[in-house]
Amino acid sequence: MSLKVFLQAGVACAALSLAGAAGASAEPLKIALVETLSGPQASTGLLYRAAVLYQLGKINEAGGFNGEKIQILEYDNQGGPVGAADRVKAAIADGAQIIVQGSSSAVAGQITEDVRKYNLRNKGKEVLYLNLGAEALELTGSKCHFYHFRFSPNAAIRFKTVAQGMKDKGILGERAYSINQNYSWGVDVENTVVANAKEIGYEVVDKTLHEVNKIQDFSPYVAKIQAANVDTVFTGNWSNDLLLLMKAASGAGLKAKFATSFLDQPGNIGNAGAIAEGHIVSTPFNPEANGEASMAFAEDYKKVTGHYPSYVEPAAVFGLQLFGEALKNVKPGEGKINTTDIALAIENASVKTPMGDYSMRSDDHQAKFPMVVQEVSKKARIKADGTEYGFLPFKTFTGDESIDPVQESCSMKRPG
């Protein structure tokens, strides 16, 4: 089944669910996907959509919640905070008790604040926000609150594991450079890279923050990196800022390895080709990392959606697996949805995903799960973007090994 057909089927199922629940006595659980579904960043939003429909479809196949199919509502946030704010209001007006989103930390910052403020004004009618992929540290730091849960890594998790994995393999070296986009995510990455240097055993000899998606020629930046004589380049760059940086590095003959967070974004390997070989990424999934379990998931996901899970999809699926497990422990409350009970159940839930043990830390609502450090290689079983290259895993960290400490800035007020 193609992704297009699958998505159309998912929308149809959601519509049927809406119709079927109309006469039911129990209040249906409505989940609103508030995601970037149009515009230049829609490719990532559509991946989240595929993951949400895949896993919520699994939950509905198993009986849904409280004897009813979960209703899936969709709203296009158009890639920005203003659009997201409007769509969250619309979703709540339409009866959604849970908001899901992932493809932008700026959008996530808007949504989490909107949800927090709404909940303060509407005691007993609180809305949950399930963050599938926005990774800014502040979301589980200064902006943490009881009704927000993050199911993805953050900068601290990604760059601790990628550095330690490279160190353990003997490919990190001693001298490192940090180059990142100049906004919250890039600053988080730079701070993490610097903070980890002494413990893991490398020196950050220089660092750069640059404009986001405005630079066409990274040659001057690469010249600066080359002059620093480094072994590893840490970068949280994504999209063209990653591709153009790596192409400029290859053109200049830079020998340093790139330690990245988003090298697995669809299209990156297709565009970079041989330039990407040997470079490193740390993510929550690799189909070869956990034997039959991880490969079986990859094949099932492809069967349903038309493509192998990659980039943001696995983390979203695994997070919703935990959510589904939590729902099993929520008792019906006189036919009404109680999101506080659901939130408490998520805090206490654990699940065995295709990558291993997955749980939620109650202190700040940061999920805990394995991370896989992997390199671009021709030896990978599943190839990326129709090329001869894929991602070959060489180090897996458990959730306990991967997760970062609770940030001091998180002061979560609990209900009651």
Curated annotation (Swiss-Prot):
Keyword field: Amino-acid transport, Signal, Transport
Family annotation (InterPro entries): BCAA_transport (IPR051010), Leu-bd (IPR028081), Leu_Ile_Val-bd (IPR000709), Peripla_BP_I (IPR028082)
Disulfide bridge partners, by residue number: none
Signal peptide location: 1-26
GO process terms (BP): amino acid transport
Pfam families: Peripla_BP_6 (PF13458)
The protein's role, per its UniProt record: Component of an amino-acid transport system.
Entry's family note: Belongs to the leucine-binding protein family.
Name used for this protein in its record: Leu/Ile/Val-binding protein homolog 4
